[in-house]
C-alpha cells in the first residue's frame, strides 16, 4: 500500500508536445501494474491536442472550469465532474478561456497516447 498527498508544489511546467498553452503536471502514481494517475493543471484557455489512448481514461475535475470534447461534442466540466473516455476515442480537454482547470487523469498502466492530425 502507498499513500500519496497531492500538493500544488509538486506541479512542474510541461513541455510535452500534446499541450497547447501553459500546463503544469505531476505524476501522482506510476509504476503500478494496471493504473497510472497524473494531475494536470491547465492555465486559462490551455488544452491538449486531439488524441487517443490505448486504454480507457477517466478524468476527475478537481478545480476550475474546463471543457472536454469528443466527436464534435463539447461539454463544460467543473469540480466533481467525471469524464469517461473509452480507449481509441479521439478527444481533447483543457481549461475554459478565462478559467484555470485541474483534473486527475486515470489511465491504464500500459496506455499509449497518440496525437491525432
Identify the meaning behind each predicted range.
Residues 37, 84, 98-116:
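A short hydrophobic beta-strand segment most commonly corresponding to one strand
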Residues 58, 65-67, 74, 90, ...:
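Structural motif
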Residues 40-43, 52-68, 106-108:
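Short, conserved beta-strand element in jelly-roll/cupin
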Residues 22, 38-53, 87:
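Conserved short histidine dyad/triad with adjacent acidic residue
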Residues 72-88:
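Short acidic-glycine-tyrosine-enriched beta hairpin
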Amino acid at each position: 500500500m502507498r499513500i500519496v498527498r497531492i500538493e500544488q508544489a509538486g506541479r512542474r511546467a510541461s513541455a510535452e508536445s500534446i499541450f497547447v498553452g501553459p500546463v503544469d503536471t505531476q505524476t501522482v502514481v506510476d509504476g503500478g501494474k494496471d493504473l497510472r494517475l497524473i494531475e494536470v493543471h491547465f492555465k486559462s484557455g490551455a488544452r491538449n491536442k486531439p488524441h487517443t489512448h490505448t486504454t480507457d481514461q477517466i478524468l476527475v475535475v478537481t478545480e476550475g472550469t474546463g471543457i472536454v470534447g469528443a466527436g464534435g461534442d463539447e461539454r463544460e466540466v467543473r469540480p466533481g465532474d467525471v469524464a469517461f473516455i473509452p480507449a481509441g476515442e479521439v478527444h481533447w480537454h483543457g481549461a475554459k478561456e478565462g478559467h484555470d482547470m485541474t483534473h486527475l487523469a486515470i489511465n491504464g498502466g500500459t496506455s499509449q497516447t497518440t496525437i491525432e492530425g
